[in-house]
């Protein structure tokens, strides 16, 4: 396993990551909620990649694992942007996005931003939010109104 490095974002955030050089589309593992690149799934992916000579990128979202910051400051869009920054900086060519649990949701958000770079998507017990797709426009409006009322707006 390669050692942890840190990528600096323009706002000063430091994102911990490990990158293994190799061939083929880079495997990019996106951990789940409150998980990190030291977890068993991430380790299994990087070990397989190393054994096959495949490129692999692991990362810890800001506020998780080895990345500094407050977990409470994390959002899906913030973490999506962190993943996109690391892919842009360290992955040449196509990527295979592998998302575990909440990482599956991030996998889809990242794929929407860089569709021409995505060779494949692999969801491991992926937990994307599909609630908007399961409701009519009227039901979504009712839910939004109830949400606004609940938070006092």
What are these regions (language model features)?
Residues 99-107:
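Gly/Ala-rich beta-loop-alpha elbow adjacent to hydrolase catalytic centers
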Residues 117-153:
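The alpha/beta-hydrolase serine catalytic core
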């Amino acid at each position: 396993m390669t050692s942890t490095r840190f990528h600096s974002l323009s706002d000063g955030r430091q994102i911990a990551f490990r990158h293994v050089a190799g061939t083929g589309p880079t495997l990019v593992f996106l951990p789940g909620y409150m998980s990190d690149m030291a977890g068993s799934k991430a380790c299994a992916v990087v070990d397989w990649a190393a054994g096959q000579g495949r490129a692999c990128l692991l990362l810890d979202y800001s506020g998780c694992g080895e990345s500094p910051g407050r977990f409470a400051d994390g959002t899906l869009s913030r973490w999506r942007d962190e993943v996109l920054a690391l892919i842009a900086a360290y992955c040449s060519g196509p990527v295979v996005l592998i998302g575990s649990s909440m990482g599956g949701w991030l996998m889809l958000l990242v794929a929407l931003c860089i569709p021409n770079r995505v060779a494949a998507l692999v969801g491991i017990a992926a937990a994307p939010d599909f609630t908007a797709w399961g409701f009519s426009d009227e039901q979504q409006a009712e839910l939004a109104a109830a949400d606004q009322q609940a938070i006092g707006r």
